[in-house]
Amino acid sequence: AYVEKPFSFNYLKTQIVSLLYNRQKEREAFSKRPFFPTNKMQMNKVDEEFMNKVIRTIEENIIDTNLNVEHLAEILGMSRSSLLRKIKMLSNLSPVDFIRLIRLRKSVELIHEGKYLIGDICFMVGINSPSYFSKLFLKQFGMTPKDFEKQSQADKEKIDMPS
């Protein structure tokens, strides 16, 4: 936000608080809403490119159940601590939680496609246990994968119905 001179300290403080609040809301939306796009988060160009590279790398290795912070840092050519610091700063999530979030968001896409069984999808996104997958999905999105699948199907049927 641009602030014209002269300005009062209270006005500046209010603007800063507002910007921080909006950024926090965007981070929450990114992690809680399955289809919230990455490019809607307020970041500078370099940070946006970095996050897109991280997401792309996770998606390219998503089936790998052993994908962890060390492996991701190695692929990206960064130290573990640098990766941790950068992801935490940009997403307000630890790298472990961020990897998990990208896995879950990919599962949402696959469920929405309607081509795969939920039991298969959990393995396709690198989670070995269907029950653990359901638990993570429920915690992240507030509904089970099965409920999301039903909702997604109902939404598709509404769209397909002639008016």
Question: What is each of the regions a protein language model found here?
Answer:
Residues M89-N128, K150-S163:
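Terminal helix-turn-helix DNA-binding modules in bacterial transcription factors
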Residues V69-I99, C122-D147:
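Basic/polar phosphate-binding segments, predominantly the helix-turn-helix DNA-binding elements
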Residues R23-K53:
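CheY-like receiver
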Residues I55-L67, I87, S91, V108-L117, ...:
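Basic, amphipathic alpha-helical hairpins
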Residues I16-Q24:
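Short, hydrophobic alpha-helical segments
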Residues F7-I16:
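C-terminal output helix
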